[in-house]
């Protein structure tokens, strides 16, 4: 039986080695579009040209960020070029979050999270894109999940970083309202992205993003996006029961890679999401020694995982795992379940020892095993 996969990897080279990190926010060889939808205008940035019938990689950022600060460090990373030469990339900025965005008029009703997801089909139609492989972080991961649930025929795969499938509870909602009266919105956003350990230890990274959130993002528009995210509904996804028709279960049908740093504030939410998804096509990647922005601070390991993911979908089969080969001397304990997802098959080919299996309820697709991964 296919099993769920839970992997821990370690990356030892930080990306932000300059104090301001601004070079990592730059766009290169991109085209920008403002596309009108039923729920308002959306700003998108295209990098590269679509390759035949291949899907495009579509990204959606988290609150307090835009596509530049959320993803450019990852896509500008050297090893990612092996992927981007095979795929066009479409970065989507939530309304009013792009660089230089003007304030919305007084009384403007910001789209709900569900409406933000429904802004994506017109984007694909306008750009003549047939399907996507989505990469979302936080709020963006939620939006792409909702999009995939509503339009499964348009989504071939998802990489969901720090995803929270749950609605905000009323206690959390009240606490956020109270904290909003007493706390700077920048601090609220930072605590969403980073845990206390990272806030105190990684001062250069925190300062880079503190300045970005405060100076580069329109504060009024940010408050609206934050309010929309805090008002999200539960995704209401559920794990299929063995023997039950998958069409009767509300779950993601595409290959899905869940990613979270082991010290991220989102760990519990991602684990909860993991428990609701079908283990046949889901992989959980828990990155060791990593905080809230794995695509920024550990791009090498995330790139490697993404390559495996794409290989399992039948793309870039000749992609070399050079970073894995270079770091084979660093061994980490990992909790893995071998599914038929991209990452699972590739990791399984690099195992050296046997497995230890734990018993689970037989009617739910949720068995686990422990392996040693050299990476």
Curated annotation (Swiss-Prot):
Residues 327-375 are annotated as: Disordered. The modification Phosphothreonine is found at residues 322, 329, 332, 355. The modification Phosphoserine is found at residues 331, 334-335, 338, 341, 352, 361, 374. The modification N-acetylmethionine is found at residue 1. GO terms for biological process: signal transduction. Residues 364-375 have a biased composition (Basic and acidic residues). Pfam families: Ndr. The keyword tRNA-binding does not apply. Keywords: Acetylation, Phosphoprotein. This is Protein NDRG3.
């Amino acid at each position: 039986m296919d099993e769920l996969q839970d992997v821990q990897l370690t990356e030892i080279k930080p990306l932000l080695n300059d104090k301001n990190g601004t070079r990592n926010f730059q766009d290169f060889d991109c085209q920008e579009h403002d596309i009108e939808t039923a729920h308002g205008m959306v700003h998108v940035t295209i990098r590269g040209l679509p390759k035949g019938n291949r899907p495009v990689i579509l990204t959606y950022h988290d609150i307090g960020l835009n596509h530049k600060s959320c993803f450019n460090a990852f896509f500008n990373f050297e090893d990612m070029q092996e992927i981007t030469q095979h795929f066009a990339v479409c970065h989507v900025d939530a309304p009013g979050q792009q660089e230089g965005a003007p304030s919305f008029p007084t009384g403007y009703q910001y789209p709900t999270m569900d409406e933000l997801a429904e802004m994506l089909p017109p984007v694909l139609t306008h750009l003549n894109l047939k399907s996507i492989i989505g990469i979302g972080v936080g709020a963006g991961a939620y939006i792409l999940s909702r999009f995939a649930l509503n339009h499964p025929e348009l989504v071939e795969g998802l990489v969901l970083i720090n995803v929270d499938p749950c609605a905000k509870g009323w206690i959390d909602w009240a606490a956020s309202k109270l904290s909003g009266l007493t706390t700077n919105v920048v601090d609220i956003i930072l605590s969403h992205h980073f845990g206390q350990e990272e806030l105190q230890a990684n001062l250069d990274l925190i300062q880079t993003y503190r300045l970005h959130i405060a100076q580069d993002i329109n504060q009024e528009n940010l408050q609206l996006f934050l309010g929309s995210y805090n008002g999200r509904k539960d995704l209401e996804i559920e794990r299929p029961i063995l023997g039950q028709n998958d069409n009767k279960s509300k779950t993601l049908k595409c290959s899905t890679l869940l990613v979270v740093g082991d010290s991220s504030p989102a760990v519990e939410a991602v684990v909860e999401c993991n428990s609701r998804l079908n283990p046949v096509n889901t992989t959980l990647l828990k990155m060791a020694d990593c905080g809230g922005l794995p695509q920024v601070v550990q791009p090498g390991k995330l790139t490697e995982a993404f390559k495996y993911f794409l290989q399992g979908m039948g793309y870039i089969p000749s992609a070399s795992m050079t970073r894995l080969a270079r770091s084979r001397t660093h061994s980490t304990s990992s909790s893995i379940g071998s599914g038929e997802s991209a990452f699972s098959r590739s990791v399984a080919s690099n195992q050296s020892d046997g497995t230890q299996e734990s018993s689970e309820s037989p009617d739910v697709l949720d068995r686990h095993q422990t392996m040693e991964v050299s990476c």
